[in-house]
Amino acid sequence: MYGLYQSPIRRSLQADIYRKPHGFIYLFGKEYFYLIKEKKVWPFIFREFQVMGLEIPDDRSKVREELKKVKYYFGKKWGNICFQFGIINEITSFDNYRARSQDIIGKVRGMRLQKRATIIKQTGLKLAFKENMPQSTITIKLAKSDEELLAEMNSGCADRVKKAIKKGVKVRLWTERDDAVFFEKRQNTAWGKGFHTITKEQYTMLLKILRKHDRGNVFISELNGEQIAGSICLFRDKTIVYLYGFTDRKYTNLWGHHYLKYGMFEWARDNGFEFCDLMGGAPTGFPEHPLAWVSKFKESLGGMKSEFYGSYDLVLNPVLYYLFKTFTRIRAKLKK
């Protein structure tokens, strides 16, 4: 997942399909793609900058020197609020199966808190108040038999996969006749969970590009011709990356979402992929995190969980940053 952020396919998604304002910046001897998020409050324009997939050197003096240059360049224009860095240096990684049998949650939480304090002290960055890059990801190694893939899951997840098979649920690849239903169910899932999704035009263009250039595909679980869950995936080298999908809540008792992931693992393995990246979740040891429920499901599938530094802000305008941070938190509370 974290290599995906600076990959050509993501640049194409953001620039050509989602048509987001963007730019390029050199940091630590490497070119990085970044997004520009503009908010217009007449007659002013406020901007946030965001680069994800950044790797920083261990020499923190070099980090401070580079950040100073970024602040000088981007801080000159009034209305520029902050530059957010999604940092992918790894804190630790561990086997999800091992995590279920050993009490390591508290240790991993402590490691993250210590790393946060060190980064803030050594670089002058602030912990981002809006998380745009997940702080962890779960990767499934696919060089296993069907039985081994099931055995790696927790007992509840494995049982649900078996029940879905007994109920007659099937997993297959998307076809054009699935287009309208998939999009509608994806929209319903997004609305039900309170987050935004892409437009129909962007969705159609995304699928067209993925299939035309063999950069990804769509997996669907169904019963008697009814779509009950779906996943859009990207292909990157020998890794298949889960992007997003839907689950039809009317059919939760069929466990199609669980079987969909298992079927996706089988297909990817049989088609030469070595890993499946489940595209992020909550940091370990933070049950209050909004992605905790997402992580719980993904962790039940087995694999390795990797913890990364996460997102930090370089403040460009302290007054605007404080006002924007306060406004964002108030708005989040009002939505609850």
Sequence positions of predicted segments:
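Conserved GNAT acetyl-CoA-binding A-motif
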Residues: K76-N96, R269-A282
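Aromatic/hydrophobic pocket-lining residues that form the small-molecule binding cavity
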Residues: V63, L67, C157, Y203, ...
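A short, internal acetyl-CoA/4′-phosphopantetheine-binding micro-motif in the GNAT/acyltransferase core
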Residues: M52-K62, A143-K144, G245-L254, A282
